[in-house]
């Protein structure tokens, strides 16, 4: 089973590496993990940081201009492979380690 984590980002140069490193470290026992980044037209150095750290995610899709979180989420859903899908904001508001609790249900 694939557990897809969609990460919509907009101007997250200060937090993007930390969140992606935390997601990469997640060790699911029952799921194969898929990390999808959606760059929602960032105008800071987020795009450059993502391009320099491709080993931290499985795929990236970009919107040329900022269309809002809803558009980023919809784009991510179009490209996911997972049977289970979650959204992880890049601003570190939620602890990525909490995603491991999903395995307790299965």
Give the label of every model feature segment.
Residues 2-4, 34:
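Cell-envelope/extracellular polymer assembly enzymes that use nucleotide-activated donors
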Residues 85:
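Short aromatic/hydrophobic "clamp" motif used to bind/position activated sugar donors
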């Amino acid at each position: 089973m694939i557990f897809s984590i969609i990460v919509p980002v907009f101007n997250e140069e200060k937090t993007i590496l930390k969140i992606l490193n935390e997601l990469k470290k997640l060790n699911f026992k029952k799921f194969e993990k898929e990390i999808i980044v959606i760059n929602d037209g960032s105008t800071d150095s987020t795009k450059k940081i993502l391009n320099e750290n491709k080993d931290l995610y499985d795929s990236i899709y970009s919107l040329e201009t900022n269309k809002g979180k809803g558009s980023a989420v919809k784009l991510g859903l179009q490209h996911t492979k997972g049977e289970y899908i979650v959204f992880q904001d890049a601003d570190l508001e939620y602890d990525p380690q909490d995603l491991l609790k999903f395995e307790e249900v299965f």
